[in-house]
């Protein structure tokens, strides 16, 4: 049997709409991500379990893990009879790369089970394709960090899909999922078709400056540049309490605060454990809307998807 864990990820990381992503894992060792296991069987089957199993499609063929198996078999030219189990620990429509977790774990599990017929680049291309079936467009800002780990900048040139961006060892990422769903398609539809030249210039300055600050290890400059002029101004209306949370983050002393992916999860970057704990407490009391919500203090997950068994 092969079992793969794929971690949660932050799409966009505020400053890099559709081109920047970061994998995260809780500091307390909690597995914030999906697991997929594969074992030999006479015919294909898929079993679902985990905290958020009730949110999965009723028809197994609509399940993205079934589609991963089907597409992987097409890619290698062979129908592989296996029993797959999806452990759905990630809320759907959360802004934590939930579908990417399932896609990455599903495809990597099949590839490991079949003795790696596909290389990492071929796998990543399939992952982007499958993720696009869920979100409506092919983009790699969740699947690349989820698969490869750390923070990744999407390039998609010269057969290079993404490149790693250095993070900061003392940064703690406080992740808060309020317990409500925001559809990625809806969150994309709310964005304008065109932007003003001034906004594009600011976006380029923030993103270029952020990448430079990461490579030159200037954490305060990097945090200052984590500003979103593309999506956040329009998506805040989909996120009850986000404006108050952003203000609280500033008051508490967080370095930056933004929307994770298309929301409703938000993240706050802190460089002191005490600040991170106070931020987590505030979010637990004021940002969560029901008992499905949660708050985790995380670090960048530099390992990415990995075998658990």
From Swiss-Prot:
- GO CC annotations, alphabetized: cytoplasm
Presence of the UniProt keyword Cytoplasm in the record: yes
Q: What is its main location?
A: cytoplasm
Matching entries from Gene3D superfamilies are given as: 3.30.230.10, GHMP kinase, C-terminal domain (3.30.70.890)
State the InterPro entries in the record. GHMP_kinase_C_dom (IPR013750), GHMP_kinase_C_sf (IPR036554), GHMP_kinase_N_dom (IPR006204), GHMP_knse_ATP-bd_CS (IPR006203), Homoserine_kinase (IPR000870), Ribosomal_Su5_D2-typ_SF (IPR020568), Ribsml_uS5_D2-typ_fold_subgr (IPR014721)
Q: What is its EC number?
A: 2.7.1.39
Which of this chain's residues are annotated to bind ATP? 91-101
PANTHER family, per the entry: HOMOSERINE KINASE, HOMOSERINE/4-DIPHOSPHOCYTIDYL-2-C-METHYL-D-ERYTHRITOL KINASE
Instruction: Spell out the family assignment given in the record's similarity comment.
Output: Belongs to the GHMP kinase family. Homoserine kinase subfamily.
List the NCBIfam families hit by this protein, alphabetically.
PRK01212.1-4 (NF002288), thrB (TIGR00191)
Q: What name goes with this protein?
A: Homoserine kinase
């Amino acid at each position: 049997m092969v079992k793969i864990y794929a971690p949660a990820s932050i799409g966009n990381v505020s400053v890099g709409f559709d081109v920047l992503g970061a994998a995260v894992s809780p500091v307390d060792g909690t597995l914030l991500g999906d697991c997929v296991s594969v074992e030999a069987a006479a015919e294909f089957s898929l079993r679902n379990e985990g905290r958020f199993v009730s949110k999965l499609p009723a028809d197994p063929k609509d399940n993205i893990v079934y589609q991963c198996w089907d597409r992987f078999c097409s890619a290698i030219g062979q129908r592989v009879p296996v029993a797959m189990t999806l452990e759905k620990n990630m809320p759907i429509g959360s802004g934590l790369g939930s579908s990417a977790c399932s896609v990455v774990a599903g495809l990597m599990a099949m590839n490991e089970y079949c003795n790696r017929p596909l290389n990492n680049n071929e796998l990543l291309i399939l992952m982007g394709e499958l993720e696009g079936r869920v979100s409506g467009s092919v983009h790699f800002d969740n699947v690349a960090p989820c698969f490869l780990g750390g923070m990744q900048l999407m390039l998609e040139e010269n057969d290079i899909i993404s490149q790693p961006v250095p993070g900061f060892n003392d940064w703690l990422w406080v992740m808060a999922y309020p317990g409500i769903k925001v559809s990625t398609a809806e969150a994309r539809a709310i964005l304008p078709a065109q932007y003003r030249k001034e906004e594009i210039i600011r976006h380029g300055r923030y993103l270029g400056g952020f990448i430079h600050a990461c490579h030159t290890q200037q954490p305060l400059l990097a945090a200052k540049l984590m500003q979103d002029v593309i999506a956040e101004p329009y998506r805040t209306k989909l996120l009850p309490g986000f404006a108050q949370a952003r203000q609280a983050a500033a008051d508490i002393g967080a370095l930056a605060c933004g929307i994770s992916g298309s929301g409703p999860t938000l993240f706050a970057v802190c460089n002191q454990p005490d600040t991170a704990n106070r931020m987590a407490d505030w979010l637990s009391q004021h940002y969560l809307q029901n008992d499905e919500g949660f708050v985790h203090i995380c670090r960048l997950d530099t390992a990415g998807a990995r075998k658990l068994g």
